């Protein structure tokens, strides 16, 4: 059975292109999620969405000698660090259609595809990936002194901020014992981070504490652990996010 590009449906979510190959008469439905990394002009393919077992097989293969050698050589040939040959989008509500293990397309075409026992699916997957790459050639036009943020970078940044937000929204101020994000006034819904410890305070309470200590000639100590601090940083999150 030959690959037929007319059977492709294309959509996108959060910088991820979703290719759905639907061949109803032959009972074939294949979903391939692809991220194009414009920093190194390459593609990352979600093997979890192709078949969840492939991700487990890949992780096991990567630990073997053959897998380690292949990853080392691919990293050398592409100039991409081994840690950047794979990316993971975690499973959460907003990512339910695109989550999974994304790996460099070379690994899919030359390694993972051979683990698929259905030769028809093999053929269609190869055709689908090659068709997408052939029709989505991208050459960045950015000055040499400009840093380009890739789609992978954007997703990792969003995930990082979502994680810290989920923790922050439950945190209580160590002085007033109110949940910081639930404070009545919007300007109070910020954290005051001390440079000396990790205790949690809303910006209003810690500023009042700081001002009172200065007015009375007392030293600037954390209200909880009494460790001396020098600076208070206003932050929307309970900790600084780099």
Swiss-Prot record:
Catalyzed chemical reaction(s): S-ubiquitinyl-[E2 ubiquitin-conjugating enzyme]-L-cysteine + [acceptor protein]-L-lysine = [E2 ubiquitin-conjugating enzyme]-L-cysteine + N(6)-ubiquitinyl-[acceptor protein]-L-lysine
Residue ranges occupied by any KilA-N domain in the UniProt entry: 21-131
GO MF term set: acid-amino acid ligase activity; ubiquitin protein ligase activity; zinc ion binding
Record keywords: Host cytoplasm, Host-virus interaction, Metal-binding, Modulation of host cell apoptosis by virus, Modulation of host ubiquitin pathway by viral E3 ligase, Modulation of host ubiquitin pathway by virus, Transferase, Ubl conjugation pathway, Zinc, Zinc-finger
SUPFAM superfamilies named in the record: RING/U-box
One example of a Gene Ontology biological process annotation: symbiont-mediated perturbation of host apoptosis
Zinc finger regions, RING-type: 173-226
The keyword DNA damage is assigned to this record: no
EC number(s) per entry: 2.3.2.27
Pfam family, one: zf-RING_2
Entry GO CC: host cell cytoplasm
Main location: host cell
Signal peptide: none
Localisation per UniProt entry: Host cytoplasm
Record carries keyword Transferase: yes
Function of the molecule: RING-finger E3 ubiquitin ligase which catalyzes the formation of both 'Lys-48'- and 'Lys-63'-linked polyubiquitin chains. Plays an important role in virulence by acting as an anti-apoptotic factor.
Family: Belongs to the orthopoxvirus OPG021 family.
Descriptive protein name: Host range factor p28
Organism: Variola virus (isolate Human/India/Ind3/1967) (VARV)
